[in-house]
């Protein structure tokens, strides 16, 4: 039986998570709901047509205010308060928190209060149980004690794996890095 996923925030990250699940984890993960302040029609259009990554290869339709992707209904909600999203009623195992708003674990916990079993925050977080960078410290994850985890930042995910290889093989005494980042809505 597939792990049920809910996505809170259907912007760039939320849509890419959705596409990755559809294209690579079909039968293993299943997106059962999204929560975004845009309506289903707008979310369907943004999922289907992407000027950076191209068109979504499957079918995307709207029926009764929900998305229908490749024939499967995905519930659509437009709640500002995560505690009001019926994750528990939908049997959601994991919520991907990708709004950029609920990055403090005390706020992200509202998803669990609404019935989700775990939360993955797609940004740097405060008070999370663990920050995970795949290929660097993902072996530290313990499902018995890590319920709200952060996926770190895009910069960390780019730099840390390469730095780990260099450090493990030759050592790093000092380091400096810089990043150029597109404008975001919290700047």
Summary of predicted features, one role per range:
Residues 1-187:
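N-terminal Rossmann-like NAD(P) cofactor-binding subdomain of oxidoreductases
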